Amino acid sequence: MEEFKRYLDLDTSRQHDFLYPLIFQEYIYALAHDHSLTRSNSLELEKAGYDNNSSLLIVKRLITHLITQMDRQNHLSFLTNDSSQNPFFGHNTALYSQIILEGFVVVVEIPFSIRVISSLDLEGKERVKSHNFRSIHSVFPFLEDKFSHLIYVLDLLIPQSIHLEILIQTLRYWVKDASSLHLLRAFLHKYHNWKNLITPKKSSFSFSKRNKRFFFFFYNFHVYEYESILAFICNQSSHLQSKSYRPFLDRIYFYEKRDHFVEVFTKYFQAVLWSFNDPFMHYVRYQGKALLASKGTFLLMNKWNYYLVNFWQCYFYMWSQPGRIHINKLSNHYLELLGYLSSVGLNSSMVRNQMLENAFLIANASKKFDTTVPIIPLIRSFSKAKFCNLLGHPISKPIWTDLSDSDIIDRFGCIYRNISHYYSGSSQKMSLYRIKYIIKLSCARTLARKHKSTVRAFLKRVGLEFLEEFFLEDEFMFSLTFPKASYISGGLYRMRIWYLDIFCIHDLANHK
């Protein structure tokens, strides 16, 4: 990063093209290959004859030939639709073009990252550790604090299809480098030749998760534009002074949001600000979805629904079906949020009041944000991974019987601890106990099948401690976290605990 920063501090005569020379640096593609390409893509590179001595040279030759074709206005004719093998190079040009895109994203991320670091250094603020904001569980404390006081929620899917030229024009506000943007435009317009990279849709495209670094950067940038305008409207409609704020774009790549909006935004949105005078609007985004909750009326939520659909279509030229947005009442609707079923329910309590000789009961009702374990989807997932049947009855895992006993227990125990760890925030533990029972009995049946015995005979021979010692490791760590657990054990098992070290949800069937 220091090398990049010194390069960007050169004389201003070169700064308008400062990104373009970096595209030809070998360490950019080495960095992209080390951190971005998945294991499957690495295998594809090996099959295509990839090696450290020739790959970077081929990438440079591909860029040079691309520029030549652009100058001749031949529109990348060397990338054909019929074959991914190009006789000019003798290599998979689509694969190396993917490497160029990964390297381009690495280059474009540099000014964003340096801008964030420089702004923090100038203001004398301490850099916040990003991993504290990456946890999936960090969303739920906010929901507990805010959503229990709200009434309606807009459950919407963020459109992922965007017009190419709109994306390039938006990127121009941040990247003052015409040469790099022209190179990017040429690649994007030729993406229909490589169906493994994106899904074509006429003049627009849908982001693909196979090219992960490329996907995350442009998806975050696209959502950033949408959320910036949305935050601007919320601040203006509530008649509050717009303050500096620093939320992050995504929980994987963090770029600072800025509070400097173009003046045209103010003129453009003056006509719609009167419709959204609601100071109790809260917004949460997760996994391509978003929640927009309010204390307002159903009419206000309908206005937001109408505005969002037209905003995506008119400003970003994206078709958004009205059915992608649902208006629900929090009191009688469950939200499928990050593996939990969340709802806002009434928590009633009775208070006995004694005044002189008269005694009477007072009924109090308060709203509470509940998070429960979705037992049916979980059982369906365990059934698909062959841990139980569709009715939830545990079965053995035949594919693991070739492993050693310790490896089998280690795999089941890892799943057991991950489930216990992730669903520690559930307000109802009975469903979680059923899932734990499925894992334990499936482990016992797998071991019994390996030793050609029954579950009863196997456990009688090795003893229950053979499994309990391993599966109770999470409870042991829990007691270390709360030293007084023995005195309030009943209350602790009813508590919801959110962790800041959960970054992803792993597939049960894929153990690494």
Swiss-Prot record:
Annotated localization: Plastid, Chloroplast
Q: Which domain of life is it from?
A: Eukaryota
| UniProt GO cellular component terms | chloroplast
Among the GO molecular function terms of this UniProt record, one is:
RNA binding
Q: Which family is annotated?
A: Belongs to the intron maturase 2 family. MatK subfamily.
Q: What does this protein do?
A: Usually encoded in the trnK tRNA gene intron. Probably assists in splicing its own and other chloroplast group II introns.
**Entry protein name:** Maturase K
